[in-house]
């Protein structure tokens, strides 16, 4: 069908071929169309504006959408949902293991070398007339078929074309699998666009007038049922430029549901004294649906009821869920939801003050706590309100329909005013000497782009080279991903460094990478086209990309060392090569005996390099050999510059000249300007360590005040808990660039806790009362130790932790079935637990007092013997440090120096012996208790 446009009498643009916009969501999907200068959400025949992304197989029927959703309870093993979590992945993907625990149907491998996933229906259900195994693409196609049917029925015409949205982090395999599903559904997908971009389009930001010449910086915060997707875009004159993306592939509304479910199940087991709760899939689904509905209600009311009839052995599950309880239970997940905001700002180099607008997308952004945390993150900026005037469940689909109109109506001025630009998620480059990664297109480069670098050979008489293309952020190619390889051959032979090979990387608007290599002297050229720019199908996910970047940061020092070693080896080879060439020059006035000695020396150095692995080479030895060669044979090295055509291109090939659309400053030498307020790398490490310390401190103080045997008032418990949670959020949202501000925050926490403790000067806060029995003490001990293990507080061998964990688990289950035993029985059990615990407890690494921390050599972190010494010194420290043994923090030895440099107005006027620890007088603790309880989780208060 030709795509023609007609105009009626009142100049309204009419589209003769409709393009629908589809938001294919984890839990619900939505479809819309742009026509007559506005978008319309297309409802189904019952008026529902969203369609459940669910497919159910029942006898000879395939049910999709709302009909399938009704079958989740009655037919759980044959009802398929959350397919978006599965599509485009492989069976060995770590996220699939997590997903398998959250679904009621079965996933199996197709037993091929690729380990593709198949959805397995219930084989025992003989009423099914369909096959029992389906590919995820087939399930997804059924949802798209239903969407297409609804759209065709609404528009009263066949629908063939669509624009489909996907999360920004979707890799090539997931995008390709989505396209395959659309093909199965009979849809021609004109474009797959990112969900955040679609949301920005729906809000009409392309035509908005911004105060800055550079346009507006917009954050799209998309928190759905299964994923969190945060994108930062710059919008200027209709151009949408993605600056950074972040998020979490497995964090969304469903994660809140499951966390609430777990706490409700703990309460149910405790009420009914159930040792091991083995509920059916049907009961699990009923509870899940009830929790989800209650959670939605809590966005508008303060209390909701979770109720499931005949939940387990005829027992009813009943739980009063309050907004306060939900916020407490999900607090850590809510804080995790804020981290991507900081990540995208850091990645783009912008600050909170640079952001002009924040758009909320996804049903989970309706949660009041999420909205409050986002506003707190942008406190003291121009963001006073969040943009959420459109329905967050529908806004992405609306944007997709707008884009569908734009690309099919090029003649419309409305279409000419908008351009979408994507970015490369990982750096692209080639393998050079010693398997180094030489980056040609850096990560986060806007596409389309084209960049070129000059290279040469590293061996004499070479007439061909293999050009290996990699993607990733590590310095060595073995740590990155191989994208493709091609060969350039037939150029003129010559000494190493003689050929001039120009390698060009070009990525077009569709993300297709083309690499060409051209040897200038012989005019030989070859290339390769890689349609899957981000790698082989099924290989990379967003979590993989995040891991690559994280590993690159963690291994930065190791990578620098390897690069330095490789550079030294390369320079020694170059010097030896230059000397060997010049010895053949007749102008060199040396006797044959001298030449023979020099050749033997050069051969010895080269042989030494060949026989050594790069890991075994010492930097000092390499530097020593390089300096010796440079000093001893300086005249011979200089002489090569006088030779005619041959130039040692090899001497610094990795810093070759750059052509194309690189910045004009590339290749130049400039003085680095460092502002006084900029933190050094050293300070950044200290800030990171101090942040971790503050977070641990807050968590431990919360656990102490919520201890069930403590005598803190409810008012003070709530006051301390709220204050500490506010401090935790501050650590994620602060723009502080000085360690002084972080240490001042620690002092502020200590001052706050001191004020609280003054109220209890004459009270034994943890004094054991008569009603606190050995059974209570045993239960509390197990809960405390269990939470400590979960929080990774014990720095000991895994085998010891496993023994302790098993003992605690067995004891807790034993307690469920032995509620009325003699007190001596509970004491015996308690002694057993304490006996096993003591060996672990005394093996822990204690946290050092900040002001008393001794100087430790920087390399001590790698020395086990020095760790042992540190531990023994710690055991001799103050009673508070020993008894409130916190996890080892990451603050290095210079912290004491930082404290000394603090201005007087920040440092306490009195010497606080334990600046990081909660100020508690241990004389008020129960002297008969061997275990000091410090880590009771919030939900027990």
Swiss-Prot record:
**CDD domains listed in its UniProt record:** ASKHA_NBD_HSP70_HSPA1-like (cd24028)
| Pfam name, any one | HSP70
UniProt keyword Hydrolase present:
no
What role does this protein play?
A: Probable chaperone.
Q: Give the InterPro entries listed for this entry.
A: ATPase_NBD, Heat_shock_70_CS, HSP70_C_sf, HSP70_peptide-bd_sf, Hsp_70_fam
What protein name is recorded for this chain?
Answer: Heat shock protein 70 homolog
Stretches of Acidic residues bias are at 856-869
Q: Where is this region: Disordered?
A: 851-887
Q: Which Gene3D superfamilies match?
A: 1.20.1270.10, 3.30.30.30, 3.30.420.40, Actin, Chain A, domain 4 (3.90.640.10), Substrate Binding Domain Of DNAk, Chain A, domain 1 (2.60.34.10)
**Keywords per UniProt:** ATP-binding, Chaperone, Nucleotide-binding
* Protein family: Belongs to the heat shock protein 70 family.
């Amino acid at each position: 069908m030709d795509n023609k446009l007609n105009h009626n009498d009142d100049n309204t643009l009419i589209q003769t071929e409709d393009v629908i916009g589809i938001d294919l969501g984890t839990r619900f999907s939505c479809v819309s169309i742009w026509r007559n200068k506005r978008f319309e959400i297309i409802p189904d025949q019952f008026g529902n504006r969203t369609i459940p992304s669910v497919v159910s197989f029942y006898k000879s029927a395939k049910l999709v959408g709302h009909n399938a959703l009704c079958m989740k309870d009655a037919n759980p093993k044959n009802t398929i949902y959350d397919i978006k979590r599965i599509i485009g992945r492989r069976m060995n993907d770590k996220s699939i293991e997590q997903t398998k625990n959250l679904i009621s149907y079965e996933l199996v491998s197709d037993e091929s070398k690729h380990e593709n996933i198949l959805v397995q229906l219930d084989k025992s259900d003989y009423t099914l007339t369909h096959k029992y195994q389906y590919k995820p693409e087939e399930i997804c196609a059924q949802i798209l078929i239903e969407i297409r049917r609804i759209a065709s029925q609404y528009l009263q015409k066949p629908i063939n074309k669509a624009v489909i949205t996907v999360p920004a982090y979707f890799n090539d395999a997931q995008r390709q699998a989505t396209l395959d599903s659309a093909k199965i559904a009979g849809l021609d997908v004109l474009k797959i666009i990112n969900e955040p971009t679609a949301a920005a389009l729906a809000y009409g930001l392309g035509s908005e007038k911004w105060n800055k010449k550079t346009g507006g910086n917009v954050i799209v915060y998309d928190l759905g049922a299964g994923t969190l997707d945060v994108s930062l875009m710059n919008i200027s004159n209709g151009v949408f430029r993605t600056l950074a993306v972040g998020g979490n592939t497995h964090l969304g509304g469903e994660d809140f549901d499951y966390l609430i479910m777990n706490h409700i199940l703990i309460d149910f087991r405790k009420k009914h004294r159930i040792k091991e709760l083995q509920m059916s899939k049907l009961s699990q689904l009923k509870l899940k649906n009830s929790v989800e509905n209650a959670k939605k209600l809590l966005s508008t009311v303060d209390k909701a009821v979770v109720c499931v009839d005949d939940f387990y052995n005829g027992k009813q599950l009943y739980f009063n869920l309050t907004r306060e309880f939900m916020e407490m239970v999900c607090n850590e997940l809510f804080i995790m939801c804020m981290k991507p905001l900081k990540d995208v700002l850091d990645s783009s180099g912008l600050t909170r003050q640079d952001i002009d607008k924040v758009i909320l997308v996804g049903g989970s952004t309706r949660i009041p706590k999420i909205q409050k945390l986002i506003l707190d993150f942008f406190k003291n900026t121009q963001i006073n309100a969040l943009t959420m005037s459109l329905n967050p469940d529908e806004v992405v689909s609306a944007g997709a329909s707008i884009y569908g109109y734009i690309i099919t109506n090029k003649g419309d001025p409305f279409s000419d005013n908008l351009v979408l630009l994507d970015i490369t998620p990982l750096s692209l480059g080639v393998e050079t000497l010693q398997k180094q990664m030489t980056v040609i297109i850096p990560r986060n480069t806007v596409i389309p782009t084209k960049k070129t670098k000059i290279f040469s050979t590293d061996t004499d008489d070479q007439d061909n080279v293999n050009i290996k293309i990699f993607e990733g952020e590590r310095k060595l190619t073995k740590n990155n991903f191989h994208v493709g390889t091609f060969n350039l051959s037939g150029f003129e032979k010559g000494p190493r460094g003689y050929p001039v090979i120009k390698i060009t990387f070009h990525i077009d608007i569709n993300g297709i990478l083309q690499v060409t290599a051209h040897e200038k002297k012989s005019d030989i050229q070859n290339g390769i086209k890689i349609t899957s720019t981000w790698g082989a199908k099924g290989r990379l996910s967003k979590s993989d990309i995040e891991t690559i970047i994280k590993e690159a940061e963690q291994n930065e020092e190791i990578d620098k060392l390897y690069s330095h070693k490789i550079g030294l080896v390369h320079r020694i080879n170059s010097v030896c090569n230059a000397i060997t060439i010049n010895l053949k020059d007749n102008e060199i006035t040396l006797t044959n005996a001298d030449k023979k000695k020099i050749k033997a020396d050069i051969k010895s150095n080269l042989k030494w390099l060949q026989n050594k692995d790069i890991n075994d080479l010492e930097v000092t030895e390499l530097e020593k050999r390089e300096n010796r060669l440079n000093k001893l044979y300086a005249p011979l090295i200089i002489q090569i510059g006088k030779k005619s055509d041959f130039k040692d291109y090899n001497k610094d090939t990795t810093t070759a000249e750059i052509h194309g659309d690189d910045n004009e400053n590339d290749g130049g030498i400039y003085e680095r300007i460092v502002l006084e307020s900029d933190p050094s790398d050293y300070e950044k490490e200290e800030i990171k360590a101090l942040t971790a310390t503050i977070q641990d401190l807050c968590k431990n103080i919360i656990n102490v005040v919520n201890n069930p045997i403590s005598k803190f008032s409810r008012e003070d418990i709530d006051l301390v808990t709220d204050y500490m949670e506010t401090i935790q959020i501050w650590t994620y949202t602060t723009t502080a660039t000085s360690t002084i501000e972080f240490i001042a925050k620690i002092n502020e926490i200590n001052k706050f806790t001191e004020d609280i403790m003054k109220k209890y000067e004459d009270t034994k806060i943890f004094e054991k009362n008569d009603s606190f029995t050995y059974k209570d003490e045993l239960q509390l001990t197990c809960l405390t130790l269990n939470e400590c293990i979960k929080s990774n507080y014990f720095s000991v061998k895994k085998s010891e932790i496993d023994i302790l964990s098993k003992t605690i688990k067995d004891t807790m289950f034993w307690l469920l079935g032995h509620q009325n035993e003699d007190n001596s029985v509970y004491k015996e059990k308690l002694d057993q637990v304490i006996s096993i615990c003591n060996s672990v407890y005394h093996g822990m690494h204690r946290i050092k007092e900040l002001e008393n921390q001794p100087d430790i050599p920087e390399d001590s972190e790698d020395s086990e013997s020095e760790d042992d010494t540190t531990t023994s010194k710690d055991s001799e420290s103050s009673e508070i440090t020993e008894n409130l043994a916190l996890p080892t923090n990451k603050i290095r030895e210079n912290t004491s120096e930082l404290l000394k440099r603090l201005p007087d107005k920040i440092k306490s006027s009195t010497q606080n012996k334990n600046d990081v620890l909660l100020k508690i007088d241990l004389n008020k603790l129960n002297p008969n208790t061997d275990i000091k309880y410090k880590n009771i989780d919030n939900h027990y208060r």
